[in-house]
Amino acid sequence: MSILSSPPLSGDNNVEMNSLSPTFSTLIAPLEAQLPYLTPLASRSNRPLDYTFDFQVRALVYYHTEAFTSAQDLLQAAPEDPLANQLIVPSTGLGESTFYEANVTRGSQQLLELVDRLAKKVSKQLKVPHPALGALVAIDGSLIDASLSMGWAEYTSTRHKAKAHLGFDLNWGLPRQLALTEGNGAERAFVSTFLEPDETGVLDRGYVDYQGFDRWIDEGKHFVARIRKNAHREVLESRPIPPGTALFFFAKVRLGDEAHRMRHPLFLVGFKSRGTIYWLVTDRADLSAEQIAFIFALRWEIESFFAWWKKHLEVYHLISRNPHGVLLQLLAGLVTYLLLVLYFHQQYGERPSLRRLRQVRRQIRQETAIAYLTIYNMDILLALILILGYQRQANS
């Protein structure tokens, strides 16, 4: 299947994206501004690329913005949707094989750079709600259903899944880094990858690693981590517990038994919330027990992000079974989310919400429909004028 470059609009109309949908043009303007600064995408042959990274990333952002459910859904819309046609199809046309080949072989480096650049741009416009707590990064993983044909996505003998590992900036509530592994891929290695010195990783029990704790401290990286209630500990110094709180334990401790004892002491906090007892450790001596508990409570933001991102941007409706293609789609989903954060902040002073997302989708569709009708009527009028002109010439 080949998608023509111009239908349903005439190529002579030369319609700009802003004319088709001012809303979508404004939404992706920060992306367009970053494109010249990304690593150039070079052709692997002597022929220049027609389906460039610019077309590729616009197509993927449009896919998530409009919540298409498959690549076929997007490609079938291109001949009928003038905005999709302009975003996706170069002047030379686009074949299905070219679209799929691009997503499984190229563009990940550019998208990684784009996520980093957009995250930095967004963070400059948002306020830090808790500056005294320092730079906080929640790290977590989310499973993605995979078909049995995706042999690389190992999970169990009967089920295949991939796993997205995410570094989430809790100071600004923004996704920052992403990696992809098979469903049973190790999580702990990404703490060192995602954390910078002087940052504090906020971690659940799956990331507990005594040797890792010592190594992160040696690297100048901090953490607030939940541990199991039966974790072996030696109390080095008891600390006062604030009255009238859910806290019941606060002490300087050393974790591990004789065979697996940590070199560095930690601070252990115990508290009860909604019937559940939590045990948290941190290497940060500057935090109070209440601050330690509060930092861990902020971790729910990464779980809320995963839920909203997956459900409303259709990020896990995969358009590729190839690991590169899956990673590319996840990165494009992060880019789309960051663009929405910027757009909603600039337009309404709000964070992304389903109500505003639906509003944006309605505006894009209405603007595109109006632009299409206007251009279609102009083509008809031009044709009538030409016909009348020919008739007059014939009669004269």
Regions found by a protein language model. Give the residues of each.
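A short, well-structured juxtamembrane/interface segment
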Residues: 119-128, 186-188
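Short hydrophobic/aromatic segments of transmembrane alpha-helices and their interfaces
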Residues: 82, 127, 289-290
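Short Lys/Arg-enriched helix C-cap and helix-to-coil transition segments
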Residues: 109-122
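Single, function-defining residue in the core of a domain
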Residues: 1-73, 77, 104-106, 113-114, ...
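Major-groove recognition helix of helix-turn-helix-like DNA-binding domains
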Residues: 87-106
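Extended, structured, electrostatic nucleic-acid-contact surfaces
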Residues: 79-89
